[in-house]
Amino acid sequence: MARPTIYRVAGQRLLVEAEDAWATRAVAALFADWYLDAEGEPAAGDPSAAAMIVRSAAPVPAVPAGLPSFDVAGGGTCHTDGGTSYIEIDGSLVVIGRSGMADAEVWMNGPLALDSAVLTRLVTYALSAALRRRRLFELHSAALAHPATGAGVLIVGPSGSGKSTQAVHLASAGWPFLTDDVLLLREAAGRVEAWPLRRSFAITAGTFAASRFLQARTRFDAADAGDDDKRLFAPHGVFTAGFKDHCVPGTLVFSGLSGGGSSRVSRVSPGEAMTRLIRMSPWSCYDRATAAGHLAILSALARQAAAYSLEAGRDLLDPEASANLMAACAAEAWT
């Protein structure tokens, strides 16, 4: 029996249906790790059309033959006709934007382990597509707020670019935090806002070793680390500066690792910032139904926030040096 549930995310409500008992458990388990708060079954005034449907007991439909295709993260393949997209991973399927269906529908190739990376990837693709159709656009970025002004600082980059390390150091230094990895962009009152998506921080043994603050308050057990050698921890009871549920970004820092001892920072033009944001947001080009809105919010963000390129060296393993550098970027952005 289908179970519809209203979830609140980034100030909006989303109707999600799980069509069997396993799907109900899977959605609840995954959404508990993200800032998606269950509000129960739909009531008067709530969305009546499902944004997303998940099922494990129904046969996986066939993908139409002859569609252009490309590889996507997680070992999957996306087939698309420009309007509808079909994402295949290990025999399971996500269908996005098909007429007469929910915005995103997931067919699992049987029940998967709840900690399966494939399950997480499939539901993430579906959720991201449903959110894009509600003008909530995902960006891989850490986000914190300057402790004096409250202005948002986004540290943008792919996995392994130093986002989590810098987020840990800044939060340890008293910066209120939003997320260390994934956020949602939305437009409100003529400004771009950033809202966190993932609840946990994910750190490597190296980040833990560089943070006396964390060492005094938590532990790193290699046995708890995932396939990417990162361990999740809940930041809310660790960092005293506290959590912010959203911010207005004033500074963008595009982060990468230099491999050297010293870090280098340079100012980036709005045009270059836009290019980098698009590079970090492939669905702004792949998903034609939402591309215009997606590109518009990235453009607005590039104009709203002062942008910097950071080639992070080993000196930023020092928490004080990291906090000082980010504070300097934020201070320059205000002038």
What are the functions of these language-model segments?
Residues 176:
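Residue-level detector of anion-binding/catalytic polar loops
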Residues 180:
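Active-site flanking residues adjacent to catalytic metal/cofactor-binding acidic residues
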Residues 166-167:
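Post-Walker A alpha-helix
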Residues 1-159, 172-173, 183-335:
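A noncatalytic interaction/capping subdomain that flanks phosphate/NTP-handling catalytic cores
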Residues 163:
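Conserved lysine of the Walker
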